[in-house]
Regions:
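Short, acidic/charged, Gly/Pro-enriched secondary-structure junctions
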Residues: 59-97
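Short, surface-exposed linear patches
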Residues: 43-44, 72-78, 101, 116-119
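Acidic glycine-/aspartate-rich tracts in secreted/extracellular proteins
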Residues: 55-60, 119-122
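Solvent-exposed edge beta-strands and adjacent loop segments
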Residues: 1-56, 89-114
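Protruding loop/beta-arch "assembly-hinge" segments enriched in small, turn-prone residues
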Residues: 109-128
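Generic preference for hydrophobic/aromatic residues in regular secondary structure cores
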Residues: 1-2, 76-78, 96, 121-125
Length: 128
């Protein structure tokens, strides 16, 4: 998992990530007329988001550096199985909508971040 920092440099933070959820959605537009007995729909706009969780890492160019400043567009890349040829990869231009820290009684410091599609370009899977 890699994400641009606020300066636009892509940073591989996969070592800090413990959980990741990807949502690639398609809006459906209801066009059902009163004369129908079932729904009619058209394909609407695509959307995408990431929900990411991890272990806090304050080292240079790691997760805290990437998410501590939430402004600006971020290129986000998720390659299933790593950056090995033919592995699936999803890349989107996103905005960071949240960066939250949690400190538990056992001393663990963890974070969650939400990233939402920004560019108006439909998210599509390709290969590394």
């Amino acid at each position: 998992f890699a994400c641009d920092d606020s300066g636009g440099s892509l940073r591989d933070i996969s070592n800090d990530v413990t959980s990741l959820s990807v949502n690639v959605a398609q809006a459906l537009i209801d066009i059902t007329g009163l004369d129908k007995s079932a729904m009619e729909r058209l394909v609407g706009l695509g959307d995408g988001s990431f929900s990411v969780s991890g272990v806090f890492n304050a080292a240079s160019n790691k997760s805290h550096d990437v998410f501590k400043t939430r402004t600006g567009t971020r290129t986000v890349s998720y390659a299933i199985g790593g950056n090995t040829s033919t592995n699936p990869i999803l890349t989107m231009e996103c905005l960071v909508d949240s960066y939250n820290l949690a400190h538990s009684a056992d001393g663990a410091l963890t974070w969650t971040a939400g990233l939402q599609l920004q560019s108006g370009t439909t998210p599509t899977w390709s290969t590394v």
